[in-house]
C-alpha cells in the first residue's frame, strides 16, 4: 500500500514544503525559491510563530485555496492559505502567499509567506494544494560513492 500524498507523518509526502527559519520553498523535495515570513524580530524566526503580526506562519498543514486574487493591500496573484484542523494557529488567521513591498522590500509580512509572483504562479499552476510548514528543512547529505 502506498503512502497517501497528504500524509502528515512524512515530509516527502507533501508536494510543497516551506521552512520558517530559512524561507525555503521546496516542491517534491527540490528547492524552488526563498522567501520570508514574519516581521522584524519575528522574520523567519520559528520561536515567535505564536506572536500575532510578528512571527512567521505557524508550522502545520495548510491548503492553498483559490482562485488567486488581486488585492489593493497585497498586490496581484495572492494565494489564500487555510489551516488543517490539527494545525495550531495560535489564534492567528488570514495567512496568504503574496508579493513583497516595492517601496520597502523585506517588510511586507506580518506572518504571510512572501514570494515573487512567478513562484506564486508556479505554485498555483502545479495543481498541488497542500503546503507543509516546518521550522527547518533537513539538510540533504550526499550519498556516499562506492
Q: Regions from the language model: what does each represent?
A:
Residues 2-93:
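Gly/Pro-biased beta-strand-loop elements
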Residues 61, 66-146:
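Exported/periplasmic cell-wall-interacting domains
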Amino acid at each position: 500500500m502506498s503512502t497517501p500524498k497528504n500524509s502528515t507523518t512524512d515530509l516527502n509526502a507533501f508536494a510543497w514544503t516551506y521552512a520558517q527559519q530559512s524561507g525555503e520553498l521546496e516542491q517534491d523535495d527540490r528547492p524552488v525559491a526563498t522567501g520570508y515570513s514574519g516581521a522584524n524580530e519575528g522574520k523567519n524566526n520559528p520561536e515567535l510563530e505564536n506572536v500575532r503580526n510578528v512571527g512567521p506562519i505557524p508550522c502545520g498543514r495548510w491548503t492553498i485555496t483559490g482562485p488567486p486574487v488581486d488585492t489593493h493591500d497585497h498586490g496581484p496573484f495572492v494565494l489564500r492559505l487555510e489551516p488543517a484542523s490539527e494545525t495550531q494557529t495560535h489564534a492567528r488567521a488570514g495567512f496568504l502567499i503574496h508579493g513583497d513591498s516595492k517601496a520597502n522590500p523585506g517588510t511586507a509580512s506580518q506572518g504571510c509567506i512572501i514570494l515573487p509572483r512567478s513562484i506564486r504562479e508556479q505554485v498555483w499552476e502545479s495543481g498541488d494544494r497542500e503546503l507543509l510548514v516546518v521550522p527547518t528543512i533537513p539538510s540533504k547529505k550526499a550519498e556516499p560513492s562506492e
